[in-house]
Amino acid sequence: MKTPRKEIARALRYMQDYKIKKESMIMEYKKFNNQYVIRIDKGEEICAKLKEVAQKENIKLAYLTGIGAAGKVTAGVFDTKEKVFKGHTWEGDLEIVSIGGNINTMNGETYTHFHISVADEAGNVYGGHLTEAVISGTGELVLTEIE
């Protein structure tokens, strides 16, 4: 019997190798027990696509981990004194060093809460609370549903 980790790695390889060339690729995902292995393609926005999966699969609570490449990322911090979100946008060739967070529901609405770290080609790392990340290459994510 294959372990879940091996199954996840196999699914990611399959999705990368089997990629059919189209003008517009769409996100793909596969479920293994309580985990969704997700590939997000160039031009797609991470938060929107993960919310789409959660709603389609009726996921009420889950946590996320992943890596990938983005061309535009907006993230920041909440200023607790001024009670305002201070966001920054980075554009260019950015490696997603790490993305993590959760999906939950409140009053029937799906909410995402993700944090991201990205690195530029000089090795500078930026990050914070994620509001937008547009994929430039591919995003490889694992969403684990909590029952």
Q: What are these regions, as identified by a protein language model?
A:
Residues 1-24:
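Enriched for short, Lys/Arg-rich terminal
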Residues 26-113, 117-147:
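N-terminal intrinsically disordered, cationic/polar leader segments
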